[in-house]
Swiss-Prot record:
Family annotation (Pfam families): HLH, PAS, PAS_11
Sequence ranges assigned to domain PAC in this UniProt record: 311-354
Residues reported to bind heme b: H119, H171
Comp. bias regions, Low complexity: 400-413, 623-639, 745-759
Function: Transcriptional activator which forms a core component of the circadian clock. The circadian clock, an internal time-keeping system, regulates various physiological processes through the generation of approximately 24 hour circadian rhythms in gene expression, which are translated into rhythms in metabolism and behavior. It is derived from the Latin roots 'circa' (about) and 'diem' (day) and acts as an important regulator of a wide array of physiological functions including metabolism, sleep, body temperature, blood pressure, endocrine, immune, cardiovascular, and renal function.
Cofactor(s) the protein requires to work: heme
GO terms classed as biological process: circadian regulation of gene expression; circadian rhythm; circadian sleep/wake cycle; DNA damage response; locomotor rhythm; positive regulation of behavioral fear response; positive regulation of DNA repair; positive regulation of DNA-templated transcription
Regulation of this protein's activity per its record: Carbon monoxide (CO) and the redox state of the cell can modulate the transcriptional activity of the NPAS2-BMAL1 heterodimer. NADH and NADPH enhance the DNA-binding activity of the heterodimer whereas CO binds the heme group in NPAS2 and inhibits the DNA-binding activity of the heterodimer.
Gene knockout outcome: Mice exhibit altered sleep and locomotor activity. Show alterations in sleep homeostasis, altering the electrophysiological properties of neurons after sleep deprivation. Display normal patterns of sleep throughout the light period, however during the active, nocturnal period, they remain awake nearly continuously for the first 8 to 9 hours of darkness and tend to fast rather than readapt to eating in daylight. Exhibit a dysregulation in the lipid and fatty acid metabolism pathways and a significant reduction in daytime contrast sensitivity.
Extent of Basic and acidic residues compositional bias: 1-10
Sufficient for heterodimer formation with BMAL1, E-box binding and for the effect of NADPH: annotated segments: 1-61
Domain of life: Eukaryota
Name assigned to this protein: Neuronal PAS domain-containing protein 2
């Protein structure tokens, strides 16, 4: 009994321990099964153990390979992995890793090419390197890549194992969001060496498969690649952040209506680098890219109108001075009591450069017609054969070859649109190569005058500028034919993509030339209209006849067309006034004096000519009241048309001797009416300031005989003129209407005889004044403040030196 009980107890304890062990084993197998990927069905214990064993084996192999390939130098931090360290090194060097075969095919490129050159790795891989180089550098870069292949069919192992670093400079095409923009090239430096690999992928159709001949190809399985680090010649201080394909990253912020930060959540610092207290109170526009400000302003205006919306993709400046692409969904929150806008809630999402480029190109495709020529970088997405872009032949590229000296380009992502420059010469400063605007290489047909009147420009802008298309097309063809021999556009026929790019460039040239031609034609039309207006004014002035009548006490301007021979001889023989200015009147017809050209009527009605008078009083020297009758022979153009008085007009004062009033009465010689005309023979000049003090000797004989006037004279009274007494009479030249003296009958015009017209000397502009001594004061004109748009005249007189004289009253032309 006792033994059976003992055996039963041992068996129970054994079963209990076995059950415990089995339960523990099942738990462990279950845990392993849950850790294995792809466990969609329930696996038995054997399958679970097999998969675990396989995973451990692969893990050991990968660890062994990683230890072999990992950097073991002391300068690599131990807390960084190989991938992290490589990424940091490439960012610090402003470069990327590229693997190129000997024929130029790109088989690998790192992701850091996107923030540096704007290309996606998928677009660059499987393409030829020559597609991204200017045509001038194709031959040299190809020789560098295939130089070691020309010695033997295959490189020696010693050549591949040696540290034969190869360095060269070239220009590389920069990617763009808009494929229609002119290509821009960045000056870069290649540093690398050749290595042999067994599993190099064969390139697909890239347009350069048949570049190398058969003997130069390396045997299959021993391909040689050029592994290089590509660096920018000039480092970029601001560049885009390389965003990997990670789960959606977003953060929330709150802004005021003035777009200032009010709140920033905890998810923002890992993305943008700023802590909340660093951005609170600052404007969001301080962190936006300058090229995106216009688009963001439109989105914010849409938000203020509709209360919610979605922004475009824009660049945000991080704390590490890098641009990260964001897209924002926002809405306006209102106060719960007064329903007034309180603040704006924004949810910012990180977007990749690939998504941004797709969105931008879709927008451009919607805005632009589909027939527009596309940039070669856009054609690459369609897996088409890409040749070197040919439009560079038609442009002024500056240098024909590769610069021998390193010339880094000073460029940044924030200024790529405005820093397009031509490729530098070998001795020039480092610049960025781009295909310049097409009009810079073509000869300009004409240049607009730099100093055009503002009024003329406004008239030219409002005039119709319709232009015949045939003339512009002929001009464009002629300019292109002239530029083709110089730029070397004599290459074989290009593919369709190149032809479309050339056609787009030529169309741009044509449009610019047509616009320039329209501006020139508008300017020519404006000048023709101005010339026509001047001709009309000259015809109007020539047709107008102004008659002037002499009034006894008043000073008048008389242009004696015919003077007595005795007076003429006396005036010509007197040497006292050798430099007396004369009014030269051109007579187009014999016996007829040219028509008077009056100065601006508005100015003449406001000005009075005051003559100097001596202290000796004259009897009956008061101004007669202006007669209300106007001459019937006075043309209507006198009151409506404002003409210009030539600057060469000189005023000569003829002062009669103090005689009785009866002697001042007109003689029978005044019975003949004469036509009074002036011709605009010289350009207009303003009055000189010193003309008011000029004096000249009188042309009156010492015997007291007054020079007879053979021509009727006219008075133009001003409405503000008043008669004065005989002791202080102030004769005033009154313009505006003709006054007929009551003692003079209306005279009829009589033509001159041909003989008299031939012998007639140039008439003088004369005005009689009162005389105090033998040599009276001449008619003195003072300057006036010329109003804008009015034309003035100057009475230029020569003043010979004279001894001091008694004080006289100076005649002046003053404003009324």
């Amino acid at each position: 009994m006792d033994e059976d009980e003992k055996d039963r107890a041992k068996r129970a304890s054994r079963n209990k321990s076995e059950k415990k062990r089995r339960d523990q084993f099942n738990v462990l197998i279950k845990e392993l099964s849950s850790m294995l990927p792809g466990n969609t069905r329930k696996m038995d214990k054997t399958t679970v153990l097999e998969k675990v064993i396989g995973f451990l084996q692969k893990h050991n192999e990968v660890s062994a390979q990683t230890e072999i390939c990992d950097i073991q130098q002391d300068w690599k931090p131990s807390f960084l992995s190989n991938e992290e360290f490589t990424q940091l090194m490439l960012e610090a060097l402003d470069g990327f890793v590229i693997v190129v075969t000997t024929d130029g095919s790109i088989i690998y490129v790192s992701d850091s090419i996107t923030p540096l050159l704007g290309h996606l790795p998928a677009d660059v891989m499987d393409q030829n390197l020559l597609n991204f180089l200017p045509e001038q550098e194709h031959s040299e870069v190809y020789k560098i890549l295939s130089s070691h292949m020309l010695v033997t069919d295959s490189p020696s192992p010693e050549f591949l194992k040696s540290d034969n670093d190869l360095e060269f400079y070239c220009h590389l095409l920069r990617g763009s969001l808009n494929p229609k923009e002119f290509p821009t090239y960045e000056y870069i430096k290649f540093v690398g060496n050749f290595r042999s690999y067994n599993n190099v992928p064969s390139p697909s159709c890239n347009g350069f498969d048949n570049t190398l001949s058969r003997p130069c190809h390396v045997p299959l399985g021993k391909d040689v690649c050029f592994i290089a680090t590509v660096r920018l010649a000039t480092p970029q201080f601001l560049k885009e952040m390389c965003v990997a394909d990670e789960p959606l990253e977003e953060f929330t912020s709150r802004h005021s209506l003035e777009w200032k930060f009010l709140f920033l959540d905890h998810r923002a610092p890992p993305i943008i680098g700023y802590l909340p207290f660093e951005v609170l109170g600052t404007s969001g526009y301080n962190y936006y890219h300058i090229d995106d400000l216009e688009l963001l302003a439109r989105c914010h205006q849409h938000l203020m109108q509709f209360g919610k919306g979605k922004s475009c993709c824009y660049r945000f400046l991080t704390k590490g001075q890098q641009w990260i692409w964001l897209q924002t969904h926002y809405y306006i929150t209102y106060h719960q009591w007064n329903s007034k806008p309180e603040f704006i809630v924004c949810t910012h999402s990180v977007v990749s450069y690939a998504d941004v480029r797709v969105e931008r190109r879709q927008e451009l495709a919607l805005e632009d017609p589909p027939t527009e020529a596309m940039h070669p970088s856009a054609v690459k997405e369609k897996d088409s054969s890409l040749e070197p872009p040919q439009p560079f032949n038609a442009l002024d590229m500056g240098a024909s070859g590769l610069p021998s000296s390193p010339s880094p380009s000073a460029s940044s992502r924030s200024s790529h649109k405005s820093s397009h420059t031509a490729m530098s010469e070998p001795t020039s400063t480092p610049t960025k190569l781009m295909a310049e605007n097409s009009t810079t290489a073509l000869p300009r047909p004409a240049t607009l005058p730099q100093e055009l009147p503002v009024q003329g420009l406004s008239q030219a802008a409002t005039m119709p500028t319709a232009l015949h298309s045939s003339a512009s097309c002929d001009l464009t063809k002629q300019l292109l034919l002239q530029s083709l021999p110089q730029t070397g556009l004599q290459s074989p026929p290009a593919p369709v993509t190149q032809f479309s790019a050339q056609f787009s460039m030529f169309q741009t040239i044509k449009d610019q030339l047509e616009q320039r031609t329209r501006i020139l034609q508008a300017n020519i039309r404006w000048q023709q209209e101005e010339l026509h207006k001047i001709q009309e004014q000259l015809c109007l002035v020539q047709d107008s006849n102004v008659q002037m009548f002499l009034q006894q006490p008043a000073v008048s301007l008389s242009f004696s067309s015919t003077q007595r021979p005795a007076a003429q001889q006396q005036l010509q023989q007197r040497p006292a006034a050798p430099s007396q200015p004369q009014l030269v009147v051109n007579t187009p017809l014999q016996g007829q004096i040219t028509s008077t050209q009056v100065t601006n009527q508005h100015l003449l009605r406001e000005s009075n000519v005051i003559s100097a008078q001596g202290p000796k009083p004259m009897r009956s020297s008061q101004l007669l009241p202006a007669s209300g009758r106007s001459l019937s022979s006075l043309p209507s153009q006198f009151s409506s048309t404002a003409s210009v008085l030539p600057p060469g007009l000189s005023l000569t004062t003829i002062a009669p001797t103090p005689q009785d009033d009866s002697q001042c009465q007109p003689s029978p010689d005044f019975g003949h009416d004469r036509q009074l005309r002036l011709l605009l023979s010289q350009p207009i000049q303003p009055m000189m300031p010193g003309s008011c003090d000029a004096r000249q000797p009188s042309e009156v004989s010492r015997t007291g005989r007054q020079v007879k006037y053979a021509q009727s004279q006219v008075m133009f009274p001003s409405p503000d003129s008043h008669p004065t007494n005989s002791s202080a009479s102030t004769p005033v030249l009154l313009m505006g209407q003709a006054v007929l003296h009551p003692s003079f009958p209306a005279s009829r015009p009589s033509p001159l005889q041909p003989a008299q017209a031939q012998q007639q000397p140039p008439p003088y502009l004369q005005a009689p004044t009162s005389l105090h001594s033998e040599q009276p004061d001449s008619l003195l004109l003072s300057t006036f403040s010329q109003q804008p748009g009015t034309l003035g005249y100057a009475a230029t007189q020569s003043t010979p030196p004279q001894p001091p004289r008694p004080s006289r009253r100076v005649s002046r032309l003053s404003e009324s």
